[in-house]
Design a protein with these regions (language model features):
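Short, well-structured N-terminal submotif of metal-dependent ribonuclease cores
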Residues: 1-52, 65-78, 150-154
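Structured helix-beta-strand junction loops
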Residues: 46-48, 82-83, 122, 139
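Short, hinge-like loop/turn segments at secondary-structure boundaries
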Residues: 67-71, 106, 143-147
């Protein structure tokens, strides 16, 4: 006698594994900076169908530029282009309209709306560690990495 719950779980895991991962900037930076969840990003990067939309490269570049300078930003982009990922350089009309609706209906940044729209239109699992994406729970499959915790250092 088969346990139907077990079969359902196994088939949903297999279904999740067949869907591509789409990495948000927060997930990619976790991998680059070896933060909590970097191992999960590394596993996703080993899959042949992992996706990186252009806003992730844009954010990675400008954040790195601000924090570590242009040389490091250039180095990171060069390394990202060597990864076994599909970089999504173009945005079609359906992705644009999906992003616009997400931005209109939810409290998320424009970049996050575009990144989520790419995931929705590509039937991908959005891997992130950005609590802003919590607003989109139920709209697309997501794998949240451990969020950063900020310690209040104020003296009372």
């Amino acid at each position: 006698v088969k346990n139907t719950n077990e079969v359902d779980t196994q088939s949903s895991i297999a279904e999740m594994q067949s869907s591509p991962y789409l990495l948000d900037t927060s997930a990619l930076l976790s991998f680059i900076e070896d933060e909590a969840g970097a191992d999960l990003v590394e596993q996703a990067l080993k899959q042949a169908n992992t996706l990186l939309p252009w806003p992730v490269l844009l954010e990675t570049y400008y954040i790195t530029f601000q924090e570590a300078g242009q040389a490091e930003a250039d180095r990171r982009i060069a390394l990202l282009k060597q990864l076994n990922v599909k970089i999504l350089w173009d945005m079609d009309e359906s992705t644009l309209l999906t992003a616009a609706k997400l931005k209109a209906e939810h409290r998320i940044s424009l970049a996050d709306a575009i990144i989520a729209a790419f995931a929705i239109r590509r039937n991908a699992v959005l891997m992130h560690k950005d609590p802003e994406f919590d607003a989109l729970t139920g709209l697309l499959p997501m794998e949240a990495l451990p969020y950063k915790s900020f310690v209040d250092t104020k003296q009372e």
